[in-house]
Amino acid sequence: MIKYGLISRVDAECIEATLNYICNDFPDDYYINIIEIGVYNGDSSRGARDFLLNQKRGVCYHAIDNEKDKPILRPFEACNLVIGNSSEVYNRFEDDSQHFVFVDGLHTLPQVIADFFCYSSKVCPGGYMCFHDTGKHLDPLSGWQGVGSKDDPDMCLGGVRKALRTIGLLNNQLPGWKLIFDEADAEDTGGGVCIFKKIKKWD
């Protein structure tokens, strides 16, 4: 079984299903391009790589982290590690270049909104964006992010799902995007993924 570190099996299965969709929908693209925001120990980076290698595909992986929590090591040798704030390095990537963007950085409402609008244009039509720690079961005041007030859910895990609702993603109100997965392990104190497909070019 491929290991994904802190990501639950439910979350991992949704991510793997999405990567499988990508492999099927882009049969002529040997290399699958991925951006991950928030690296930590790199387990999810290695998990996605291992899954794609098992599918006989290559991976061009960019991992972004600002090292606020700790020094970050490159998850694997071929990974391109970018040290910096996600909202400051997004223009290093070409528009319509990525098959999959995994957002697991600063879990506050304003940062999740910023990450969507900074990176949505980087996703190619038919590609996907995945947001972590979106479970409906989560205590919105859990997982304070170290900024703002501990009593403000927008500065805690509650900010992630609220951000997706504010953008219009959760109810399929944002043109050009479609909700594919909204799943979580109810026994997990964190976690959950919302995965959205880009169904037309962002403009």
Predicted regions: what is each one?
Residues 1-102, 106-203:
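A short alpha-helical cap/connector motif
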